[in-house]
């Protein structure tokens, strides 16, 4: 079955396809499109680029009349802010130099560790959609969405970045999903670290 992407992706897709670079939509944009039949315009859309995201981000901002913001030069992460219908949409670009599989392994929860090659996105009536068969899902995120469970990608997901605890709670409240036992245990074990953030 097909799932619709938020309208703001249309603008960016046309541009990315014209650039002949291998890139993927990752994380929340896929998750939200699957969970909600009418994906609302979310704050940001994550894009993993096999190449230098900082260079591509600058080019994108210039071509689309957006604002370029460098978030993490060392890891090649930047943001392009575009105005669409009086709203701002953030596109966060990451350099995925070691391939998309490595990129997903470093993500927080299985339901965010999914990717979609932009080549597999179809246009239909003014919007864009994708088929579940084309979603890269090495950690079982689709199954966890179906079962309404938040599960960390690895045993060290939370301890490596304690802020993810807050993200788990936020996702849990927003979608009324359960946090898995293993992930709850990780949260408990790293709760002392959150004060250091």
How would you label these PLM feature ranges?
Residues 1-197:
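Catalytic cores of the polymerase beta-like nucleotidyltransferase superfamily
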